């Protein structure tokens, strides 16, 4: 079974990689820099501020905005962890030749002035790119350019790691010894532990509900658990209690916590920080946001605190700065040779420090891909039987492709005695680039969560968290019945919460305008004046709807008149073009910069007091595109705490032929405050 599973994934990953590379190459070779910026695939008007040494053979290139153009960096869709190219701005993207890496500029030695690296940190005023030290000479030439730009490219490292993992899975010989892997390849039946089941006597968090306690008790006593946490049900709090109870049961327990993104694991780390001794926590990889509470656990920062390591790093940085002033290429080369000798010494000392830090820790937090990092796996080189971990926890499992989830299982094979998966398979699956092969799409969109419950139809290992602490009961009602079999309950503390209950909101609104008292509003945009438009400036002509934008603006201004805070409002849409137009109006023209505007996909895991959802689609053919993806809409309608405002054409949803959309729109006609706007009132 392991060979069959690995073979299926290897062919799917290969196809997905090819599709991803072809799509990216086509865009980079056919669009201008400005078009790439508009589509979020490039950042321009930046310059090199500094180069410094990083951990184990890394350089950090720090880039800032060109103040002659803008005082802030327009980040687009580029995020931490993305693979990027850094180039001088005078280079034009080749639009005539086949995709290839092109010589953009040369230094005196004829080397290509182009760097490839990983986005390490991002803010509105600085981007840090992690480079391999082999690019040091090229990187320093960028000081001579007033403008640089960044291009987002395909992350082939991700595909390489998944393929390597699948090959190793296929090579495991029968009979498989690893009990957890036996479950996952359907070679071992799952039988819940009933003989030696021991209930936890005392929970540390007094606010846990019965479903959370049941999930924790089950996970403590069983070697395979899925914690199904719908939106707002306190999944993270449940995991935090579980981790603490594992350490109480066995103080020597070693836990690896993984997730598909930096944000997912950083949230857990942030919550663990005040509850677990600092020396037991270790964060491996590049944190998406270096919060103060997380910095103290970063392997990078902790290793650099070693006095000798710090001294060598400072000497390297000093030599790098001196290189800025050297005009002669020969002198620069000599300087780099000295730097390379220092780096060799630095690597040895860093590896020793890193090994000590890992062994000292009890909880290691990293992404799924980071779980096979050389820092962790190097411990097996000296002792292949070294017991590094006991428990693996994968959070947000439904946002990861299954091959990603196998990375820690294979990298640390025969280590784990317990596997805990947490997530919600009714929210968005991982993003798949393939569009032309249904088998590939199915293989990669079917998550480990989904496949396990198919293998074990009794679902004995699935523990459902049934109380949500986010949404007003009316907002929760349709998602509960349509996606969670009506099992979701609103806690009494949130069941009737409204915008008017916020401390800043005017408590005595006029009788004619009581939007702060209503949890669910729908602006029905039927009619020719609310027709969608294809935005030719965006990739594949993403859709936008100017009429809906006008309604969004009016509703925001109404909320602001009642002193609803800007940062309590979120505006989301399934379409990038609509998001771009909304940002231009709300952020640039109205200067309401604290209102968060995002795609639905980008808002997964977030929440706001009020969410305004612009559906965009309004056409005579009743086409809805990817609105028919139930999980995307489930994410959208479960983001708000106190008010959900939908702006969309009800007739299109009811006549598009999709049962879910028809059911939702009909339910809202009965349960929401439905309004029929006249476009003339909004212009």
From Swiss-Prot:
InterPro entries noted in UniProt: AAA+_ATPase, Coronavir_polyprotein_1ab, DNA2/NAM7-like_C, DNA2/NAM7_AAA_11, P-loop_NTPase, SF1_C_Upf1, SMUBP-2/Hcs1-like, SMUBP-2_HCS1_1B
SMART domains: AAA (SM00382)
Organism superkingdom: Eukaryota
GO biological process, one term: postreplication repair
Residues holding ATP: 229-236
SUPFAM superfamilies tied to this protein: P-loop containing nucleoside triphosphate hydrolases
Primary location: cytoplasm
Induction annotation: By heat shock.
Catalytic activity: ATP + H2O = ADP + phosphate + H(+)
NCBIfam families: IGHMBP2 family helicase
Role according to the record: DNA polymerase alpha-associated DNA helicase which may be involved in DNA replication.
Stated name of the protein: DNA polymerase alpha-associated DNA helicase A
Organism of provenance: Saccharomyces cerevisiae (strain ATCC 204508 / S288c)
Organism ancestry: Eukaryota, Fungi, Dikarya, Ascomycota, Saccharomycotina
């Amino acid at each position: 079974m392991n060979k069959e599973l690995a073979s299926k994934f290897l062919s799917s990953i290969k196809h997905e990689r090819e599709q991803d590379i072809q799509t990216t190459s086509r865009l980079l070779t056919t669009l201008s820099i400005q078009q790439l910026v508009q589509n979020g695939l490039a950042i321009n008007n930046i310059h090199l501020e500094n180069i410094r040494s990083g951990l184990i053979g890394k350089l950090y290139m720090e880039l800032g905005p060109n103040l002659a153009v803008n005082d802030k960096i327009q980040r687009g869709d580029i995020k931490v962890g993305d693979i990027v190219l850094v180039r001088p701005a005078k280079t034009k993207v080749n639009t005539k030749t086949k995709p290839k890496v092109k010589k953009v500029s040369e230094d005196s030695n004829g080397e290509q002035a182009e760097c490839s690296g990983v986005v390490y940190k991002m803010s509105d005023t600085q981007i840090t790119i992690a480079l391999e030290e082999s690019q040091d000479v090229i990187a320093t030439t960028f000081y001579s350019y007033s403008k640089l730009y960044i291009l987002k490219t395909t992350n082939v490292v991700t595909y390489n790691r998944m393929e390597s993992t699948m090959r190793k899975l296929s090579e495991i010989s029968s009979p498989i010894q690893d009990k957890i892997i036996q479950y996952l390849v359907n070679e071992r039946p799952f039988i819940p532990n009933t003989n030696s089941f021991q209930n936890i006597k005392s929970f540390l968090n007094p606010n846990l509900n019965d479903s959370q306690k049941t999930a924790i008790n089950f996970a403590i006593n069983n070697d395979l658990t899925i914690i199904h946490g719908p939106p707002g049900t306190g999944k993270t709090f449940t995991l935090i209690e579980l981790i603490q109870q594992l350490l109480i049961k066995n103080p020597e327990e070693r836990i690896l916590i993984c997730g598909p993104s930096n944000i997912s694991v950083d949230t857990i780390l942030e919550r663990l920080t005040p509850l677990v001794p600092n020396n037991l926590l270790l964060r491996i990889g590049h944190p998406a946001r270096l919060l103060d509470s997380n910095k103290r656990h970063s392997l990078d920062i902790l290793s650099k605190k070693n006095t000798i390591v710090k001294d060598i790093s400072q000497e390297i940085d000093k030599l790098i700065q001196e290189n800025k002033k050297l005009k002669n290429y020969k002198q620069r080369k000599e300087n780099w040779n000295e730097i390379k000798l220092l780096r060799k010494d630095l690597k040895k000392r860093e590896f020793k420090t890193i090994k000590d830090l890992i062994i000292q820790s009890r909880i290691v937090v990293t992404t799924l891909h980071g779980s096979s990092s050389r820092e962790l796996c190097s411990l097996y080189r000296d002792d292949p039987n070294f017991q590094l971990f006991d428990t693996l926890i994968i959070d947000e499992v439904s946002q990861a492709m299954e091959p990603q989830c196998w990375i820690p299982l294979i990298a640390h094979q025969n280590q784990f005695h317990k596997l805990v998966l947490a997530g919600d398979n009714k929210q968005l699956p991982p993003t798949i680039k393939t569009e032309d092969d249904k088998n590939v799409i199915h293989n990669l969109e079917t998550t480990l969560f989904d496949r396990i419950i198919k293998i074990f139809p009794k679902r004995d290992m699935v523990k459902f968290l049934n109380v949500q602490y986010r949404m007003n009961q009316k907002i929760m009602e349709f998602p509960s019945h349509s996606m969670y079999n009506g099992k979701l309950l609103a806690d009494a503390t949130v069941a009737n919460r409204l915008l008017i209950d916020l401390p800043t909101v005017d408590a005595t609104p006029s009788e004619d305008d009581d939007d702060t008292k209503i949890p669910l509003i729908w602006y029905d945009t039927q009619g020719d004046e609310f027709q969608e438009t294809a935005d030719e400036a965006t990739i594949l002509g993403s859709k936008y709807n100017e009429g809906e934008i006008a309604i969004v603006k009016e509703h925001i201004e109404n909320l602001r008149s009642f002193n609803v805070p800007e940062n309590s409002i979120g505006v989301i849409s399934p379409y990038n073009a609509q998001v771009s137009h909304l940002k231009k109006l709300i952020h640039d023209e109205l200067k309401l910069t604290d209102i968060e505007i995002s795609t639905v996909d980008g808002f997964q895991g977030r929440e706001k007091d009020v969410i305004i959802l612009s559906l965009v689609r309004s056409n005579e053919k009743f086409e809805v595109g990817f609105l028919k993806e139930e999980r995307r809409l489930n994410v959208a309608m479960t983001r708000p705490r106190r008010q959900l405002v939908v702006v969309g054409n009800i007739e299109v949803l009811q006549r598009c032929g999709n049962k879910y959309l028809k059911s939702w729109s009909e339910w809202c006609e009965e349960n929401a405050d439905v309004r029929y706007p006249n476009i003339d009132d909004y212009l």
